[in-house]
Amino acid sequence: MTINDPIADMLTRVRNANMVRHDKLELPASNIKKEIAEILKSEGFIKNVEYVEDDKQGVIRLFLKYGQNNERVITGLKRISKPGLRVYAKANEVPKVLNGLGIALVSTSEGVVTDKEARKRNIGGEILGYIW
C-alpha cells in the first residue's frame, strides 16, 4: 500500500501511540522523517530515536515520553501543509504555536527546523505541522 502523505502518516502514528500510551513505535524511514524525529527529541517531546537499517528503506523507532503520573508530554499534533493545499510562510510570518508553548515544523532550504530556529535564522518555508 502506498502512502500519499508520509509526514501525515508519521504524525498520525505518533498521535495514536501517544493516545494509548505505548512506549515505542516504529515507522518507515525517510530523510525528512529522520529530521522531524531529531527535532522531537531535541525539543523534549520524545525520549529517544533509533534508526534500524534493513534491506528496504529502514525503520525509525521512536520512544515516547510521559510525565511522572503517566501524563502525556505530547498533547496535540496537527498537519498544516497538505499535498492538496500547501501552506508557506515568509521569514517574518512564521507562526507561533500556543504563544511559544508548542512548536511549528518548518521545511526550509536548510532542512526541517522549528519555528523558533526559522525566526532566528530569518528564513521561511513550508509549515509542515504543529506539535504542542
Swiss-Prot record:
Gene3D superfamilies: 3.30.1370.30, 3.30.1490.10. It holds the Pfam family Ribosomal_S8. Transmembrane segments: none annotated. The keyword Secreted does not apply. GO terms for biological process: translation. GO terms for cellular component: ribonucleoprotein complex; ribosome. It comes from the Bacteria. Keywords: Ribonucleoprotein, Ribosomal protein, RNA-binding, rRNA-binding. GO terms for molecular function: rRNA binding; structural constituent of ribosome. Belongs to the universal ribosomal protein uS8 family. One of the primary rRNA binding proteins, it binds directly to 16S rRNA central domain where it helps coordinate assembly of the platform of the 30S subunit. HAMAP family: Ribosomal_uS8_B. Part of the 30S ribosomal subunit. Contacts proteins S5 and S12. This is Small ribosomal subunit protein uS8. The gene is rpsH.
